[in-house]
UniProtKB/Swiss-Prot annotation:
Pfam families: SYY_C-terminal, tRNA-synt_1b. PROSITE patterns: S4. Disulfide bonds: none annotated. The lineage of its organism: Bacteria, Pseudomonadati, Pseudomonadota, Gammaproteobacteria, Enterobacterales. L-tyrosine binds at residues 37, 175, 179. Catalyzes the attachment of tyrosine to tRNA(Tyr) in a two-step reaction: tyrosine is first activated by ATP to form Tyr-AMP and then transferred to the acceptor end of tRNA(Tyr). It comes from the Bacteria. Residues 356-414 form the S4 RNA-binding domain. Keywords: Aminoacyl-tRNA synthetase, ATP-binding, Cytoplasm, Ligase, Nucleotide-binding, Protein biosynthesis, RNA-binding. This is Tyrosine--tRNA ligase. One of its GO terms (cellular component) is cytosol.
Amino acid sequence: MLTDTLIQEFQDRNLISQITNEIDLKNILLHNKISLYCGFDITADSLHVGHILPLLCLRRFQNLGHRPVILMGGGTSLIGDPSFKLLERQLNSIELVHTWKQKITKQLSLFLKFNVGKNNALIVDNYEWFKNINVLTFLRDIGKHFSINQMIVRDAIQRRIKRLDQGISFTEFSYNLLQAYDFYFLNKQLDVILQIGGSDQWGNIISGIDLIRRLHKKRAYGITVPLLTKKDGRKFGKTELDTIWLDKMKTSPYKFYQYWMNISDSDIYSFLKMFTFLSLSEIKALKDTTKPTELNSVKKILAEYLTNLVHGSNEVRAIQRITSSLFSGKFSEMKETDFFQLEQDGMPSVQLYNSGNLQQLLVYSRLALSRSHAKSMIVSNSVRINNIIQNNPFYILCNRDKMYHKYTLLSRGKKNFCLLCWTK
């Protein structure tokens, strides 16, 4: 892939939702190595799968000699981005945000290279420049360039204003100015000319481009990647129960792997283009030679690729052992050492100290959202204990459910498992 075809490559991989001044940007990339950035607000102690796509976009640029800059929103995380948020975010302390930042920094090295010379990836924190800004100076020098008329008609703001139960605070409303200033600051200090973000960031990116034009008389550019959602409207990276994190202590490698195995059949080839570095010709060959009934083999390629990227090859091999055991259906043939291996390999598990109510255990093991949800699954024959359907909603697990006096395999449907480990 040559530099002059980078934007075309992005388009062929469905990686561009919107782009500014496409012809100019293509010409710049043809003749120059640039610095570009993507911002991440620090709202938790781990990245999640929704962050993978923009990070891989930065990596594609870095592979061609461009310098990626990661902006950690240590400052803006204290405010909260209202973009496509229905409710105002809880504000976190400076100390907590700093602790989270340290954990996230380690995860970034999974995607970007920090020791390759001229185009080393760089991490910056906007708290470092916002902490010393005088509010009067900011409003006079920066605020005067923003039109309330333009800001208030943006979709994200309108959605919040129209909610009778939840408006928008000035704190969140001002976020647009802060992100625009980020782009201006990075352009001035590091010659960053391109910002990448999710499609929900388009308005903020345009504000930054306008601010650079007004204050620097220079051109800057923006690309947004698609904001992926599932068929039910849920944001990509979330299941019906929780978020899929990159931290193995928050989401087990097995659960991470299964998330990709469970994507819609209609998404698989698009996701291979977007989330892997397989060539487009390789992906086309897969599509041309794979029967509709064999799509799980293609999902396996995607799941193993991303699990290896985030968790490493050892975890992939461990997951292969788990899936081989679980989906063979031959639980009666499993040895005690096999169950122990499942526990060690990262299969979701919970400790059980005495007999347990099935509804309660389904909730505790995160196989159900609530006891009422658990009850409906049980009576609809969706719950199995050691691969045997249990449709009594008041069932109490007891000694006869133990295998080797210690293990019970609880499942919801065909793909969701939890290992109950009884303690003596």
